Amino acid sequence: MWFNPRMSKNFRVVALIGKYQSPEVAEAVLRIAEFLRVRGLDVWIEQGTASSIGMAGQFAVASYEEIGAQADLAVVLGGDGTMLNTARRLSQHGVPLVGINQGRLGFLTDISRDEALPKLGEILEGRYTEESRAMLDAEVLRAGHRVFQTLALNDVVINKGDLGRMIEFDLSIDGEFVYTQRSDGMILATPTGSTAYALSANGPILHPNVGGIALVPLCPHALTARPVTLPDTSHIEIVLLPQHDARIHFDGQARFDARAGDRLRVTRSPDVVRLLHPQGYSYFAMLREKLHWSATPRRP
């Protein structure tokens, strides 16, 4: 295979991060690792990935902290869930991410497994488009003390707890009371998360370049409670009212069990996720494909 020795000059250390316990990902990780090694790159396998797919000893193994500190590029193999987890762990380090789709929809992992090697080759040669995705910084306060904090790339969701009944909460924005809502919960979504859970709850699609946070009620008791898009400079606070418990989910991966009186505070994080796409990537083409826009109804 032809190789340009000037390629990859900006990517010397490449980390591979794969979905755990997936035979298909194991094969893809090995194939891509060999592809990168032939090009003279230092290949690191994230330690959980290496352990899960049995590659320890074949390549250098590194923790997320080591990848964040020293890797020039991280290639994520899996679905959007794997990318969300990786993004939260590496965003503070500024490591650019490339997504190889081994899952289903793949809004974030936009390179198909069949095109992985040629598309990676293009990116290593510098032929790519880079974009930054906003994240949310969320914290929970109890009796004035912070008891939980994390980041989210997609969304923060507060919803009903074990009893399965509606919850009631106060919503304030920038210190101003907005309303008291009774509902199954609320989704706070980034532009990236606007095509996830928020979309299925009739929320708006926000272009990634829009500086906004979507508030999408879940089955509100008042039918006039509609989705609202706020500037991403907003400070959002939700206070869970008495006699209600709730669960708060972050990107559908981390969870916190909230009690009455707990305060959920959400702002835009100063950290961003750097995504690299092959040349020719189009956000609207991606939506058209994933959401089946322009599809012609067919008779059975």
Swiss-Prot record:
Organism: Aromatoleum aromaticum (strain DSM 19018 / LMG 30748 / EbN1)
Coiled coil: none
EC number of the protein: 2.7.1.23
Binding site for NAD(+): 80-81, 154-155, 165, 182, 184, 195-200, 253
Parts of the chain that traverse the membrane: none
Catalytically driven reaction(s): NAD(+) + ATP = ADP + NADP(+) + H(+)
SUPFAM superfamilies the UniProt entry points to: NAD kinase/diacylglycerol kinase-like
NCBIfam families, alphabetized: PRK01231.1, PRK02155.1
Enzyme superclass (EC): transferase
One of the record's GO cellular component terms: cytoplasm
Protein name, per record: NAD kinase
Keyword Cytoplasm: yes
Family: Belongs to the NAD kinase family.
Signal peptide extent: none
Required cofactor names: a divalent metal cation
GO MF annotations in UniProt: ATP binding; metal ion binding; NAD binding; NAD+ kinase activity
